[in-house]
């Protein structure tokens, strides 16, 4: 029963995009690479639109510019780690120079 409970772990946090270009293609590619390291299902959402964080096409649909609040949500055994890793990427401005 414990393993089943762990597989259903869900975690979410909100972050603000603080890089000048927002969630552009290069940044979206980095999100996909980080999210794909985890077995959990991972989503990013903006307002009423939620997309798979492992899909670059989905991420481009968010059209998230500088200052946009993004919710990162994950469900699975490593949900918290996935959200924290993506949060660190977002807070690092996608490791890009301003």
Predicted feature locations:
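Short, intrinsically disordered low-complexity segments
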Residues: 1-4, 25, 45, 72, ...
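Positively charged, low-complexity intrinsically disordered leader regions
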Residues: 2, 10-12, 18-21
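Long, contiguous binding/interaction regions
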Residues: 2-6, 33, 61, 81-85, ...
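Intrinsic-disorder/low-complexity, polar/charged segments enriched in Ser/Thr/Lys/Arg/Asp/Glu/Gln
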Residues: 7-14, 69-71
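Compact, glycine-rich, soluble single-domain proteins
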Residues: 16-66, 74
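C-terminal structural segments of small proteins and small subunits
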Residues: 65-98
């Amino acid at each position: 029963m414990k393993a089943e409970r762990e597989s259903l772990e869900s975690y979410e946090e909100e972050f603000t995009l603080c890089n000048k270009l927002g969630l552009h293609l290069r940044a979206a590619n980095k999100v996909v690479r980080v999210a794909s390291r985890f077995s959990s299902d991972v989503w990013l959402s903006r307002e009423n639109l939620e997309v798979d964080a492992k899909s670059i096409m989905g991420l481009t649909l968010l059209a998230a510019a500088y200052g946009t609040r993004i919710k990162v949500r994950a469900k699975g055994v490593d949900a918290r780690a996935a959200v924290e890793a993506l949060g660190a990427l977002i807070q690092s401005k996608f490791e890009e120079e301003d």
